[in-house]
Amino acid sequence: METATLVAISISRLLVSFTGYALYTAFGQPSEQLRDPFEEHED
């Protein structure tokens, strides 16, 4: 394979894995530990 193809595949895999980790953090098990500032604020 050419170098440009390997670089493009590597960058794509990095972006996909980062997106997957962000979704897991937002909606997976760790999301229970996140605080919600809108629920904490009382009018």
UniProtKB/Swiss-Prot annotation:
Location of the protein in the cell: Plastid, Chloroplast thylakoid membrane
A Pfam family that the UniProt record links to this protein: PsbN
GO BP term, pick one: photosynthesis
Transmembrane segments: 5-27
Main location: plastid
Keywords: Chloroplast, Membrane, Plastid, Thylakoid, Transmembrane, Transmembrane helix
Keyword Transmembrane part of the UniProt annotation: yes
Membrane topology recorded in Swiss-Prot or TrEMBL: Single-pass membrane protein
InterPro entries the record matches: PSII_PsbN
GO cellular component: chloroplast thylakoid membrane
Family, as annotated: Belongs to the PsbN family.
Purpose: May play a role in photosystem I and II biogenesis.
Protein name as it appears in the record: Protein PsbN
Lineage: Eukaryota, Viridiplantae, Streptophyta, Embryophyta, Tracheophyta
